[in-house]
């Protein structure tokens, strides 16, 4: 199930974004990128509709995935 990011309290959304960024450990190359910049990048992807927040009832978990990943996979097959 998609959770609209606009429906989340701003603190809740920020905590979710920080948790996601820290969990993902995305590599940004030679240059260090601050946590705030990484969070802002994911926030922009949500605002632009490139990413969605997905809740899995089966796994009782929440994740952020690309819109393309969500559109092409059953919700229970989306990587956590």
UniProtKB/Swiss-Prot annotation:
Segments crossing the lipid bilayer: none
InterPro entries with a match to the protein in the record: UPF0270, YehU-like_sf
Pfam families: UPF0270 (PF06794)
Record-stated family: Belongs to the UPF0270 family.
Name of the protein described by the UniProt record: UPF0270 protein ASA_3305
Organism from which the protein derives: Aeromonas salmonicida (strain A449)
């Amino acid at each position: 199930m998609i959770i609209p990011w606009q429906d989340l309290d701003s603190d809740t959304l920020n905590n979710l974004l920080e948790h996601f960024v820290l969990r993902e450990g995305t590599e940004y190359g030679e240059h260090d990128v601050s946590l705030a910049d990484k969070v802002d990048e994911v926030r922009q992807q949500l605002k632009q509709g490139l990413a969605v927040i997905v809740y899995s009832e089966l796994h009782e978990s929440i994740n952020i995935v690309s819109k393309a990943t969500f559109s092409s996979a059953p919700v229970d097959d989306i990587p956590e």
